[in-house]
Amino acid sequence: FFTLLLLVAFSVNSYSQNSTSSPYSFYGIGSLDFRGTTENRSMGRLSVYNDSIHMNFKNPASYTGKNLFIFNDEGRLVKFTVGLNYNETKLSSNNQNSLASNTSFDYLGLNLPMGKFGMALGLIPYSSVGYKLESSNDINLIKYKYEGLGGVNKAFLGFAYQISNNFSIGFDAKYNFGNIQNSAIEFLYDDDNQPLDYQSKESNRSDLSGINFNFGLIYSGTIFKEYTLHGSFAYSPSYNLSSINNRTFASVVFNSISGLDFPINQIEVDLESLDLYKTDLVMPNRLNFGLGIGKEKKWFIGSEITTINSSVFSNDLIDIENSKFEDSYLLSLGGFYIPDYASFNKFFNRVVYRTGVYFEKTGLNINDQSINEFGISFGLGIPAGGLFSNINTSFEFGKRGTKKADLIEETFTNIHVSLSLNDRWFIKRKYN
């Protein structure tokens, strides 16, 4: 228990670190960060499959299930999972390239069985902001410099109930919290194209909070005697994030060697008089449906679609020209294969081999160009530390964006590692 508290404290602190270097995190509340657990990501971000030893944050109905009723109903597994992420991105425009990387804490979750009920709690990221951008004038002098960091995280508590052998339902409540900071420096030059002693800087900070809910339904049933049909449905209604905003203007001295700027005079804008001190960000609803088929502890293949009405998103504080949000979707196809789950003399026969592919319309439109993302993934589920615990890995390779209309194309590699710990906490002792 003490170790769990340390992990929670560490994760909250680690969430202050940037997990993205994408220039597209400049828009909205940043790049959507959480795409599922390591297992989900290794199957093309597929979440329709559920089992007794892995958590599924995308559908709260997974917090219980008939596959938890093992050991003659006496030792249902308590599930704990923690994940880490490494990202490397090549940023390419029509005239230059750059490389960026980030390492971050990914997620933390605990799932407790309670008879036909199940309870889960955890901490996951939602969005991340992390960019440094420059724009130049006709003679290649820096005109503007933009920088942003922060993001939104979710702490959740959920419950599920096993209706029958085939159906389970669930819901969770998520508390959203975080902040986003961004700044812009405008560079001015004299007649000899030398930078002036003082430049002007605008800084914005938004502290965000709010609650949203997620509802889920899961089906699992036998067909053709030896195969299992899996179905899932999840819905998250639209909600508002409350934003407390602060804006300052300053004259700064810029050090071209260190890249740091030092404020000389700073003025805080009276946002309250502009009715912008406290604003509400309208967040979209989300609908997810998945279907798959497999043979228990042998193989599985499934597909999934997630739709988001991103066009309703609004932020009164910041209005960026030539950009808008449009409705978005995610298509996933993936699965896994286990050579021999019961093998005890050949280790690699018990390894889970996962792979998948996905396409996402992100919902961001810049200069009349829809920003899309495509990726392939694969990963392993490696038995570790006992019969039920395992280490999971995921490797994602993909592209986001375009070079058209003076935009940026990202080529990225995401590496995820997670630890799934499973144990029997509630066992009825028997004596002869």
Located regions from the model:
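Bacterial Sec-dependent N-terminal signal peptides
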Residues: F1-S22, N432
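Subset of outer-membrane beta-barrel
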Residues: Q17-N432
